[in-house]
C-alpha cells in the first residue's frame, strides 16, 4: 500500500513537470515558427526583388535586341535599295550599250551602202566620164549626207550632255550617300551615348545589387546564427525530453511493480476465496448433518431420546471451534472485500493516470516528431535557400561576366566603328578631294572643249566663207568659160594674171587654213599628251585602234592612187610639206596654156569643197573614218576623171583632201578619247559610289 501511494505521488509530480515542459516547448515552437516565417518572408522579398531586377535587365536586353533588329532591318532595306539602284544603273548601261550597238549597226549599214555607192560610182567614173553637173549633184548628195552626219554629231553631242547629266546625278547620289554617312555617324554617336548611359545605369544597378547581396549575406549569417541558437535550444529540449522519457520509464517500472502487487493481491484474494469456499462447504456439510439429524430424530424417537446428549455434545464440540473459524473467515472476507475495493479504486485511478500519462507522452512524442519534421524541413528550406543563393550568386557573377564581356565587346565594336568611321571619313575626304579634282579637270576639259568648239565654229565659218568664195569664183570661171569665145579680144596674159592672182589668193587662204590646222593639231596633241599622262591605260587601246584604222585607210588610198605616182607621193608627204605641194600645184598652172587653166579652176574649187566637208564632220566617232577616206578617194577619182577629160597634161591637184582627212582622223580620235574619258569618269564615279556603299554596309 505504501508503495502504491509513493508511485501515485511520483506520478502526480511527474505529470506537473510534463505540463510545464509542454508549455515551454509550445512557446519555443511558436517563437521558432514566428522567426522562421519572418526570415522566410524576408528571403522571399529578397528573392522577389532579385527576380524583378533580373526581369528588368531581361527587358532592357530585349529592347536593345529589338533596336538592333530594327537597325539590321534598316541596313537590309538600304542594301535592297542599293541593289535596286545598281540594277537600274546596269539596265541603263545595257540600254545605252544597245543604243550604241544600234548606232554602230546603222553606221556599218550606211558604210556598206556608201561603199556600194562608191564602187558603183567608181565603175561609172571608170566606164564613162560624166559632166560637171553630175559631179555637182553628187557633191550635193554628199553634202546632204554630211549634213546627216552633222545631225548625228549633234545627236552625239546630246548623248554627251546626257552622260554629263548622268555624271551630275551620280555626283548628287554621292552627296546623298555622304549625307547618309553623316546621318549614320550621328546615329552611331547617339547609340554610343545611349550605351554609355546604359553602362552607367547598369553599373549603378550592379552596385545596388551588390549592396543587396551583402545585406542578404548579413541576413543569412544572422539567420545561421539564429538557426544555431535554435539548434542549441532544440538540443536542450531534447535533453529535457530525454529526462522526461527516463521519468516515464521509471513510472512504467513503478506501474509494473504495482501490477505485480495487484497480481499478489489477486492471488491472496483467490486464496481467500478458496478458503471461503472450503468454509462454505464445511458449513453446508454441517447443515446437511443437521438435516440428517432432524431426519434421524423423526425416524426414531429412541435414537433421539437416546442420543440427545451425544448430539448436543457433538454440536458443542463442533460449534465452538467452527464459530471461531467462521468469525475469523468472515473478518478476513470483510477485510479482503474492503482491500479489494480499495485496490480496484487504486487500479482504476492508476489506469486513468497511466492513460493520461500515455496520452501526454504520445502527444509529446508527436510534437517532437513534428518539430523534428519541421527542423528537417527548415534544414531542407535552408539548404534550398543556400542553393538558391549560390545560384543567384553564380547568375549574378555570370551576368557580371557577360555584362563585362558585352561591355568589352561593345567598347571594341565602338572603337572599331570609330576607326572605321575615321577611315571612312578619310576615304570620303580623299574621295571628295579626288572628286573635286576630277570636277576641276572635267571643268577644265569642258572649257577646253568649249574653246575648241568655238574655234571649230570659227573655222567652220571661215570654211563657209571660203566655200562661198570658191562658189563665187567657180561662177566667175564658168562665166569666163562661157564668155571665152565672146571675149576673144581679151589677151591671154591678162587672163593668166587674173587667174594667177585668184590662185595666189586661194593658196594664201589655204596656207592660212593649214596654219590654223597645225595650231589646232598642236593644241590637240598637247591635250592628248596631258590625257595620256593622266589616263594612259585608257588611251593606249584607242591609239592602237586609231592606228589600225589609219593603216586600213592608207591601203585603199594607195590602191586608188596607183594611176598617178606623183599624187600618192604627195598624199604620203602631204602633212609634212604642204607649202611645197601648193607651190608644185601652182607651177604647172603658170606653165600651162590658157584654155587648160579655165578647166582647172573648177577642179580647185571641187578640191576645196571636200576639205570644207571634212572640217564640218570633225565631231563624228571613229567608225566614220573609212567613210571619210572613201569619200576623199571618190573625190580624187573624180579629179582623175576630170583630168583625163581635160585631155592635155594631167595637172596635180592641191593636197587639201589628204590634210583634211588627216585632221578629221585626229579630230575623231580626240572625240573618241573624250567619250572614253567621260565613260571612264562615269565608271570611276560608279566604283566610288559602290565603294562608299560597301563601306556603309560593312560599318552597319
From Swiss-Prot:
GO terms for molecular function: K48-linked deubiquitinase activity. The keyword Magnesium does not apply. Pfam families: CEP63. GO terms for cellular component: centriolar satellite; centriole; centrosome; cytoplasm; spindle pole. Residues 593-603 have a biased composition (Low complexity). Polyubiquitinated via 'Lys-48'-linked ubiquitin, leading to its degradation. Deubiquitinated by USP36, promoting its stabilization. Residues 73-283, 343-533 form a coiled coil. Keywords: Acetylation, Cell cycle, Cell division, Coiled coil, Cytoplasm, Cytoskeleton, DNA damage, Mitosis, Phosphoprotein, Ubl conjugation. Residues 570-603 are annotated as: Disordered. It comes from the Eukaryota. The modification Phosphoserine is found at residue 278. The modification N-acetylmethionine is found at residue 1. It is found in: Cytoplasm, Cytoskeleton, Microtubule organizing center, Centrosome; Cytoplasm, Cytoskeleton, Microtubule organizing center, Centrosome, Centriole; Cytoplasm, Cytoskeleton, Microtubule organizing center, Centrosome, Centriolar satellite. Signal peptide: none annotated. Belongs to the CEP63 family. CEP63 and DEUP1 paralogs are both involved in centriole amplification: while CEP63 mediates mother-centriole-dependent centriole duplication, DEUP1 mediates de novo centriole amplification in multiciliated cells. Required for normal spindle assembly. Plays a key role in mother-centriole-dependent centriole duplication; the function also seems to involve CEP152, CDK5RAP2 and WDR62 through a stepwise assembled complex at the centrosome that recruits CDK2 required for centriole duplication. Reported to be required for centrosomal recruitment of CEP152; however, this function has been questioned. Also recruits CDK1 to centrosomes. Plays a role in DNA damage response. Interacts with CEP152 and CDK1; these interactions recruit both ligands to centrosomes. Interacts with CDK2, CDK5RAP2, WDR62, CEP90, KIAA0753/moonraker and CCDC14. CEP63, CDK5RAP2, CEP152, WDR62 are proposed to form a stepwise assembled complex at the centrosome forming a ring near parental centrioles. Interacts with CCDC57; the interaction is required for their location to proximal end of centrioles. Interacts with FXR1; promoting its stabilization. This is Centrosomal protein of 63 kDa.
Amino acid at each position: 500500500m505504501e508503495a502504491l501511494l509513493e508511485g501515485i505521488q511520483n506520478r502526480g509530480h511527474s505529470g506537473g513537470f510534463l505540463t510545464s515542459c509542454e508549455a515551454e516547448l509550445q512557446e519555443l515552437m511558436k517563437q521558432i515558427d514566428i522567426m522562421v516565417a519572418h526570415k522566410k518572408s524576408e528571403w522571399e522579398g529578397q528573392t522577389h526583388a532579385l527576380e524583378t531586377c533580373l526581369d528588368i535587365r531581361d527587358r532592357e536586353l530585349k529592347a536593345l535586341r529589338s533596336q538592333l533588329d530594327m537597325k539590321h532591318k534598316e541596313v537590309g532595306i538600304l542594301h535592297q535599295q542599293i541593289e535596286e539602284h545598281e540594277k537600274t544603273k546596269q539596265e541603263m548601261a545595257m540600254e545605252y550599250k544597245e543604243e550604241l550597238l544600234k548606232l554602230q549597226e546603222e553606221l556599218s549599214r550606211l558604210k556598206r551602202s556608201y561603199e556600194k555607192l562608191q564602187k558603183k560610182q567608181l565603175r561609172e567614173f571608170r566606164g564613162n566620164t560624166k559632166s560637171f553637173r553630175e559631179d555637182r549633184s553628187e557633191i550635193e548628195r554628199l553634202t546632204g549626207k554630211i549634213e546627216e552626219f552633222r545631225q548625228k554629231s549633234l545627236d552625239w553631242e546630246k548623248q554627251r550632255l546626257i552622260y554629263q547629266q548622268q555624271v551630275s546625278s551620280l555626283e548628287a547620289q554621292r552627296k546623298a550617300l555622304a549625307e547618309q554617312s553623316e546621318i549614320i555617324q550621328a546615329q552611331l554617336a547617339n547609340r554610343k551615348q545611349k550605351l554609355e548611359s546604359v553602362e552607367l545605369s547598369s553599373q549603378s544597378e550592379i552596385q545596388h545589387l551588390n549592396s543587396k547581396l551583402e545585406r542578404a549575406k548579413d541576413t543569412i549569417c544572422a539567420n545561421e546564427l539564429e538557426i544555431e541558437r535554435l539548434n542549441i535550444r532544440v538540443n536542450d529540449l531534447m535533453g529535457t525530453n530525454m529526462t522526461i522519457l527516463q521519468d516515464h520509464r521509471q513510472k512504467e517500472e513503478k506501474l509494473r511493480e504495482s501490477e505485480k502487487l495487484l497480481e499478489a493481491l489477486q492471488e491472496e484474494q483467490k486464496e481467500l476465496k478458496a478458503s471461503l469456499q472450503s468454509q462454505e462447504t464445511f458449513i453446508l456439510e454441517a447443515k446437511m448433518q443437521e438435516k440428517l439429524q432432524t431426519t434421524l430424530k423423526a425416524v426414531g424417537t429412541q435414537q433421539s431420546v437416546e442420543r440427545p446428549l451425544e448430539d448436543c455434545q457433538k454440536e458443542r464440540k463442533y460449534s465452538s471451534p467452527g464459530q471461531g473459524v467462521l468469525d475469523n473467515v468472515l473478518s478476513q472476507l470483510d477485510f479482503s472485500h474492503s482491500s479489494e475495493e480499495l485496490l480496484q479504486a487504486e487500479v482504476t485511478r492508476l489506469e486513468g493516470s497511466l492513460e493520461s500519462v500515455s496520452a501526454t507522452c504520445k502527444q509529446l512524442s508527436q510534437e517532437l516528431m513534428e518539430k523534428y519534421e519541421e527542423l528537417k524541413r527548415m534544414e531542407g528550406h535552408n539548404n534550398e535557400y543556400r542553393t538558391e543563393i549560390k545560384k543567384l550568386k553564380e547568375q549574378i557573377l555570370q551576368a557580371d561576366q557577360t555584362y563585362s564581356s558585352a561591355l568589352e565587346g561593345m567598347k571594341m565594336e565602338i572603337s572599331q566603328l570609330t576607326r572605321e568611321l575615321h577611315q571612312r571619313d578619310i576615304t570620303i575626304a580623299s574621295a571628295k578631294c579626288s572628286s573635286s579634282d576630277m570636277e576641276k579637270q572635267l571643268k577644265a576639259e569642258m572649257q577646253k572643249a568649249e574653246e575648241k568648239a568655238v574655234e571649230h565654229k570659227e573655222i567652220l565659218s571661215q570654211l563657209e566663207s571660203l566655200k562661198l568664195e570658191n562658189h563665187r569664183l567657180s561662177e566667175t570661171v564658168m562665166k569666163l568659160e562661157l564668155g571665152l569665145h565672146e571675149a576673144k579680144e581679151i589677151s591671154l596674159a591678162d587672163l593668166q594674171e587674173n587667174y594667177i592672182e585668184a590662185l595666189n589668193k586661194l593658196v594664201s587662204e589655204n596656207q592660212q587654213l593649214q596654219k590654223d590646222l597645225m595650231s589646232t593639231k598642236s593644241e590637240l596633241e598637247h591635250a592628248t599628251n596631258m590625257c595620256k599622262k593622266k589616263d594612259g591605260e585608257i588611251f593606249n587601246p584607242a591609239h592602237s585602234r586609231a592606228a589600225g584604222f589609219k593603216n586600213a585607210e592608207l591601203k585603199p588610198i594607195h590602191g586608188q592612187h596607183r594611176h598617178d605616182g606623183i599624187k600618192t607621193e604627195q598624199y604620203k608627204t602631204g602633212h609634212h610639206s604642204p607649202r611645197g605641194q601648193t607651190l608644185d600645184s601652182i607651177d604647172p598652172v603658170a606653165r600651162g596654156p590658157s584654155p587648160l587653166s579655165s578647166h582647172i579652176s573648177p577642179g580647185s574649187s571641187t578640191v576645196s569643197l571636200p576639205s570644207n566637208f571634212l572640217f564640218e564632220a570633225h565631231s563624228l566617232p571613229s567608225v566614220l573614218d573609212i567613210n571619210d577616206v572613201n569619200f576623199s578617194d571618190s573625190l580624187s577619182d573624180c579629179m582623175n576623171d576630170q583630168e583625163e577629160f581635160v585631155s592635155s597634161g594631167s595637172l596635180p591637184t592641191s593636197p587639201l583632201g589628204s590634210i583634211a582627212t588627216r585632221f578629221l582622223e585626229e579630230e575623231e580620235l580626240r572625240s573618241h578619247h573624250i567619250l572614253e574619258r567621260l565613260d571612264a569618269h562615269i565608271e570611276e564615279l560608279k566604283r566610288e559610289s559602290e565603294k562608299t556603299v560597301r563601306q556603309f554596309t560593312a560599318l552597319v
